[in-house]
């Protein structure tokens, strides 16, 4: 049973990454112009200078944040499918509902984790107290922390999903 679940999650992850690449290439083809390309290059150079990080590091960090966010959405949807298909009636509606609830709980866990860290870190707590722009080091710390939090959430949700799948549920 665990192998079936892992094959489904792997196929979903591959489809997600393929979709991300196709969207990026499509946007590049549709919107490419020398002016836009120069604008993006100048913006990346400027932002990487402000954050004291290489352009590659900047792009990698943001791609990682987006990827773990989308993976959280993916595993939340799978959780919704598993819980929804355990019921006899309204499987699709319940799958969407449980998926949304799982995703909302994951986002609340991220927010709660950031708040808990903010209790000991005044820089991060500024997110909750003011609308001022964050210090560069605080923002970098926050991005790295969020990546770790999302990875923990993804692992926990997958452990729950494997447990539910092993108990028996027909998702075909």
Q: Whereabouts are the PLM-identified features?
A:
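Central hydrophobic cores of alpha-helical transmembrane segments
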Residues: 92-105
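Short, membrane-exposed interhelical loops at transmembrane-helix boundaries
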Residues: 45-51, 120-142
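Juxtamembrane non-transmembrane "cap" segments at the membrane-aqueous interface
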Residues: 32-42, 106-128
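Hydrophobic alpha-helical transmembrane segments of multi-pass membrane proteins
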Residues: 63-71, 100, 148-152
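Helix-loop-helix units of permease transmembrane domains in multi-pass membrane transporters
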Residues: 1-13
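Junction motif at the cytosolic side of a transmembrane helix
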Residues: 80-92, 152-172
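Membrane-embedded or membrane-proximal helical elements that form or frame transporter/channel pores
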Residues: 56-60, 132-149
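Secretory targeting signals
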Residues: 10-81
């Amino acid at each position: 049973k665990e192998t079936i679940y892992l094959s489904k999650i792997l196929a979903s992850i591959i489809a997600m990454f393929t979709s991300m690449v196709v969207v990026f290439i499509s946007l590049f083809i549709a919107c490419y112009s020398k002016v836009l390309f120069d604008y993006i290059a100048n913006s990346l150079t400027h932002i990487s200078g402000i954050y004291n990080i290489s352009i590659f590091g900047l792009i990698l960090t943001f791609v990682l944040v987006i990827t773990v966010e989308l993976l959280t959405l993916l595993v939340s949807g799978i959780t919704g499918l598993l819980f929804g298909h355990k019921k006899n009636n309204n499987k699709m509606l319940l799958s969407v509902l449980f998926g949304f609830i799982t995703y909302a709980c994951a986002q609340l866990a991220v927010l709660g984790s950031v708040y808990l860290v903010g209790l000991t870190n005044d820089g991060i707590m500024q997110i909750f107290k003011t609308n001022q722009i964050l210090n560069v080091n605080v923002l970098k710390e926050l991005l790295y922390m969020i990546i770790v939090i999302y990875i923990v959430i993804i692992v926990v949700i997958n452990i729950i999903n494997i447990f539910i799948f092993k108990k028996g549920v027909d998702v075909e």
